[in-house]
């Protein structure tokens, strides 16, 4: 593996870490309704736990209400139960074939708890990025030791990987700041 391949590989993995962070943050509830928070809920569908997004369409009725439209009318009760049993503190209301999920306003205390969760997710993402940097640098050192690349190439590649790491950490900080602002906005 060449130094360029190591840099490309590290960059791709850092991008995946950022995407994973964004995916995890969608699940953290803010004051606004977001259908993404319901996607990880599993519904009992003929004896099989099935993701909610596969048995119903999710949409927004307004800024504080999510509409859940089951594909089968018989699923209304099971979906309602799954949402109620989730640890999100939501209370779905059935209106015939549509389930409305109003998002209760967050208390100040709950907002602070959620910002701590968001910061923790951000720290986990930074740790993942730094581990990727360490792995790439170790790989470069092995190549230098085995005389496959020169020390100058190693130094250049190490500097490039550090720049990628710095950029990824800045991006993580921006994502976290945006989510915290979203949570703290009443």
UniProtKB/Swiss-Prot annotation:
GO CC term, one of those recorded: cytosol
- State if Manganese is listed as a keyword: no
State the InterPro entries in the record.
Ribosome_recyc_fac, Ribosome_recyc_fac_dom, RRF_sf
Ordered alphabetically, the record's keywords are: Cytoplasm, Protein biosynthesis
The question of whether Protein biosynthesis is a record keyword is answered with yes
Q: Name one GO biological process term.
A: cytoplasmic translational termination
Q: Which domain of life is it from?
A: Bacteria
- Location(s), subcellular: Cytoplasm
What family is this protein classified in?
Belongs to the RRF family.
Instruction: Read off the HAMAP family from this record.
Output: RRF
What does the UniProt function comment say about this protein? Responsible for the release of ribosomes from messenger RNA at the termination of protein biosynthesis. May increase the efficiency of translation by recycling ribosomes from one round of translation to another.
Q: What is this protein called?
A: Ribosome-recycling factor
The species this protein belongs to is Polynucleobacter necessarius subsp. necessarius (strain STIR1)
């Amino acid at each position: 593996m060449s130094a360029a391949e190591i840099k490309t590989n590290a960059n791709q993995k850092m991008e995946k870490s950022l995407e994973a962070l964004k995916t995890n943050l969608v699940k953290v509830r803010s004051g606004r309704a977001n259908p993404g928070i319901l996607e990880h809920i599993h519904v009992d569908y003929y004896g099989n736990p099935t993701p909610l997004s596969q048995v119903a369409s999710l949409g927004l009725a307004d800024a504080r209400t999510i509409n859940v439209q089951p594909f089968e009318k018989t699923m209304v009760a099971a979906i309602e139960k799954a949402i109620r049993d989730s640890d999100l503190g939501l209370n779905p209301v059935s209106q015939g074939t549509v389930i409305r999920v109003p998002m209760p306003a967050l208390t100040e205390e709950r907002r602070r708890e959620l910002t701590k969760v968001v910061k923790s997710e951000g720290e986990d993402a930074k740790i993942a990025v730094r581990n990727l940097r360490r792995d790439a640098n170790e790989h470069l050192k092995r190549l230098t030791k085995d005389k496959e690349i020169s020390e100058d190439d190693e130094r250049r590649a190490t500097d490039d990987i550090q720049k990628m790491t710095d950029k990824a950490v800045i991006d993580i900080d921006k994502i976290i700041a945006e989510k915290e602002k979203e949570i703290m906005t009443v």
